[in-house]
């Protein structure tokens, strides 16, 4: 199986980046951060992201999701709306909120390249950072990588079973929301799929968009043969 390493065009149009992910974290990450802050704990630490068992009793997994992790880290900052919401929870002190206002990630990220075959208990992403920063990014990194590795792995297994025949990704309508469907399409191409039905994923990630036609097309003609013939006239290739 040939896995693909797909990078974002850094100047490209990432529609999903309009959804700010700073608060995509578990509350206890924030309360622990404040605890570290109050106790003057900001030692440089190492957090490793790994998994314990292969999905679906398989023998391997495929690494995916790194590019979205990078984008998340680069854009990580607390704006006035974030600070106001955290203040409304009445569990964070003003000195800690002032710290968050100027927050920027200053650590280092080490990672296995996307498309690499991976195995249980080996680090996929290593975060080396002050403990408050490493704690904050834990949840989002796991959320992104767990989902996309799962999709890339499933795609790789399907492509292997196809024994050289082309496989396309067509999962948008059954995905758990727009971001899952779109980043899942990218992960499926990393796993070996030839392209996706998802037009937004094609625009965002410059991957081939593919498709057939629906049964509604066939039903709009008097018989199946006519429906196929008319579609073939429009799209002979």
What is the predicted function of each stretch?
Residues 7, 12-44, 53-55, 91, ...:
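Buried, small/hydrophobic-residue-enriched core segments of structured protein domains
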Residues 45-101:
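N-terminal, Lys/Arg-enriched amphipathic/low-complexity engagement segments
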